[in-house]
Amino acid sequence: MEEFNHQTIDPDLFTISDVICDNACFYRAIANYMYYATPHDNLTKVKRFYSWGNTKSVDKVNEKMGQYSEIQNNLAEFIQRKIVDYVENHKDDILPQTGMSIENSIQLIHELTLDEYLSYYDVFAGDIDINQDLEKEEFYIDRWGSIIEQYVISKIIGCPIIVFNTQRYDTTYNKISNGKIINNKPQKGVRLKLSAVIGEEYIGTKLPIFLIWREYNKNGHYLVIYPNNPSTVLSEINI
């Protein structure tokens, strides 16, 4: 138990905010954080990441963005488009997490060719799209956010992306189990386990994006988390 606490992080360092559980939860979580991490209401300035790190209040972000809003939809669609453009123009970049090019990483992780990826991801993940055809059969492509998309966003904004998952120590069975988050509140005993740090070269230069990834209804789901003290959060989590 002591080792578990030492290797995990108190969730009270953050304010947790869920987004709707659709195919675009990754992009929606990023959209909410973009709005939080800039002081501007003008979406053009938000989309240019002006004054990144001069944060808005979480109350204001939750009021404007919440689980779903038109502003969120706008920003989520924008950031997905930026990712597609970056991938198209940097397909040979080496992804540190795989040691392979972005193109080959797409084949490994998404099981798509580059051309398929560019075509499918050109459709916003939040849009219902059941009319695509493969060998005369309808199918649906899950445009989920993987380490590829995390890496690209880190490059676009020039900031780290730090991803946690939620864990809980089960004292009855003396084992670690998945931790639940209900109504943006962690279940008693739930702590955050560092899962990935993307864009380590940007640590200390720009405010990171903080996310939680967890299983939800047997699928992956992203939540956004806002540091309660942005200026000290990295030292508090020992990064």
Residue ranges and their predicted role:
Residues 118-239:
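Deubiquitinase catalytic domains
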Residues 2-15, 20-174:
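Papain-like cysteine protease catalytic cores
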